[in-house]
Amino acid sequence: MRFFGKFIKRNYDPKTDSDVLFSLSSAYLTLESKIGLKNSGRCALSLKSISGMYFNEMKEDIKRFLDISKTDFELAYRTVTDSYGYLWVILEGKRMEDLLAGISAVGDTIDEKGFSNQLLAAVFEFTNDRNKKQYLIYNYKRNSFYPFVPVDGSQKTRNTEEEMKMMATIGDEVPLEKDMTLWYPLWDLPL
């Protein structure tokens, strides 16, 4: 199917979501060594909830998978529905590789069940030396990452200087969204 997809789709991109997500497996080390950002051990996947039996079955499949694979990936998980109606699957683990495998598998399950259009983002949390949170967000629709650094205690203000620093640091390692107007802020993240 992928072969014919090259001819049918105008914007064919051979990289799957999993390929792009796993590009973070080395980039997180660069963030730590060059600008001191450490993986917090938390990430989340967000998707728009819809009512219906098949969506509920998909949620149960995700929970079953995560329950079974807890020991393999050394992950804890929880789900939260936010005030906008988005379902968040939140993963916690010590190793970035486990987080990436878990979030990729959850995304693949959603895709296999036919709900890929509901996917919003995968969010990876980092902390700096002052324990301030910074995020790298993967936009499923754009197949790219972008930084998000909220300013603590402010009324929804971003630290664009820190965002640009993150982008410059890993720009050669992961596909980054070049159009900054598409760097959507995700306020009040449930991480």
List each model region and its residues.
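Extracellular/secreted glycoprotein ectodomains characterized by long, lumenal stretches
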Residues: 69, 95-107, 114-117, 144-145
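Charge-rich, low-complexity segments
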Residues: 1-56, 148, 156-191
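Generic detector of well-ordered alpha-helical segments enriched in charged/polar residues
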Residues: 5, 19-22, 56-63, 100, ...
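Helix-rich interaction surfaces within compact, conserved domain-sized segments
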Residues: 111-185
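Short, flexible loop/turn elements at secondary-structure junctions
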Residues: 51, 93-95, 142
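A glycine-rich, hydrophobic loop/mini-helix early in the fold
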Residues: 33-88
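Extracellular-facing segments of soluble proteins and assemblies that are Gly/Ser/Thr-biased and enriched
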Residues: 77-108
